Amino acid sequence: MTALDHPQPRPGIKNIAAYVPGRESAPGVEKIWKLSSNETPLGPSPAALEAVREASQHLEIYPDGSASKLRDAIAKAHGLNPANILCSNGSDELLALLAQTYLMPGDEGIYTEHGFLVYRIQILAAGATPVVAREKDERADVDAILAAVTERTKIVFLANPNNPTGTYLPMEEVKRLRSGLPRKVLLVLDAAYAEYVRRNDYEAGVELVSSNDNVVMTRTFSKIHGLAGLRIGWMYAPIHVVDAVNRVRGPFNVNAIAIEAGTAATHDKAHVERAVEHNETWRTWLAQELEKLGLRVTPSVANFLLIHFPENGSKTAEEADAFLTARGYILRRVTGYGFPHALRLTVGTEEANRGVIAALAEFLER
């Protein structure tokens, strides 16, 4: 059979590098600590788990196509108008829908040098051209983003905080970015890790969306809420953006269990605070211990750390990854993000955190 004997994808699709999730297993290793996907070590809210059990008794019924119960809960929690909220099958779906809605061949979409790989994928999937803005000190550079804007630019994706670096832009810098963009350019603020940030100069994007017609904020229940397996995301956006995206999103894109679990998780603020406290304590401890081992760590405000290894010799990131994996500690290689000499470590349970530091110390002392 030749290539012409079966249907072919449109030009450009096969040039897209598929997203590769963090690993979750290691051959021959019985006990695994998965520290590769920035999942919360505290798991979901007990209230969310109870909501899952109750909702699972009625799976023959289609979910509410507008996810109004979840939208109302989110709106109440954040002081927003539910009409400006759109829920989704994970925030990744929103990134795809926004690209599909606002990009076409000939357009350009901008993302930063070490930004989330899904941005590039969705820009290409829409037939548009991805444009990379250089970062400075492993942080988004507003001047570089603005310099990359052309008459063909239609969308700018900014992860704030960023994955995999854990760095962030203060709100004044994000405001400066918005002010410098043409009104026709949509600024997408991906705030997947917003709940973890405890900095006075940070704001996830609510203020900018509320006061502008070309800013969108996306959020997720996959991180601090511990509902990654249910795929729940949401967007706060101007009414005209919500209306446009609603025209292309699939019907019933948020399932019934996700709606109930997300609603319950939104109400359980105590669980979120416990997760924040755990993360603050152990992220600080991990960073200090890693630096004691002589490793450079990018300062992070999220629930993960980017660890830098020597570029040469026997203590490389690749060898560290193999050593740790053989002992059950699975971290994330970030070569695709422009960091071939680094590993990303999720803040885990106390057992996982202490264990991975001990294993790294053993690796470095060999």
Swiss-Prot record:
<dbReference type="InterPro" id="IPR004839">
    <property type="entry name" value="Aminotransferase_I/II_large"/>
</dbReference>
<protein>
    <recommendedName>
        <fullName>Histidinol-phosphate aminotransferase</fullName>
        <ecNumber>2.6.1.9</ecNumber>
    </recommendedName>
</protein>
<keyword id="KW-0368">Histidine biosynthesis</keyword>
<dbReference type="InterPro" id="IPR015422">
    <property type="entry name" value="PyrdxlP-dep_Trfase_small"/>
</dbReference>
<keyword id="KW-0032">Aminotransferase</keyword>
<dbReference type="GO" id="GO:0004400">
    <property type="term" value="F:histidinol-phosphate transaminase activity"/>
</dbReference>
<feature type="modified residue" description="N6-(pyridoxal phosphate)lysine">
    <location>
        <position position="223"/>
    </location>
</feature>
<keyword id="KW-0808">Transferase</keyword>
<dbReference type="GO" id="GO:0000105">
    <property type="term" value="P:L-histidine biosynthetic process"/>
</dbReference>
<comment type="similarity">
    <text>Belongs to the class-II pyridoxal-phosphate-dependent aminotransferase family. Histidinol-phosphate aminotransferase subfamily.</text>
</comment>
<keyword id="KW-0663">Pyridoxal phosphate</keyword>
<keyword id="KW-0028">Amino-acid biosynthesis</keyword>
<dbReference type="GO" id="GO:0030170">
    <property type="term" value="F:pyridoxal phosphate binding"/>
</dbReference>
<dbReference type="InterPro" id="IPR005861">
    <property type="entry name" value="HisP_aminotrans"/>
</dbReference>
<comment type="pathway">
    <text>Amino-acid biosynthesis; L-histidine biosynthesis; L-histidine from 5-phospho-alpha-D-ribose 1-diphosphate: step 7/9.</text>
</comment>
<dbReference type="InterPro" id="IPR015424">
    <property type="entry name" value="PyrdxlP-dep_Trfase"/>
</dbReference>
<dbReference type="InterPro" id="IPR015421">
    <property type="entry name" value="PyrdxlP-dep_Trfase_major"/>
</dbReference>
<dbReference type="Pfam" id="PF00155">
    <property type="entry name" value="Aminotran_1_2"/>
</dbReference>
<comment type="subunit">
    <text>Homodimer.</text>
</comment>
<dbReference type="InterPro" id="IPR050106">
    <property type="entry name" value="HistidinolP_aminotransfase"/>
</dbReference>
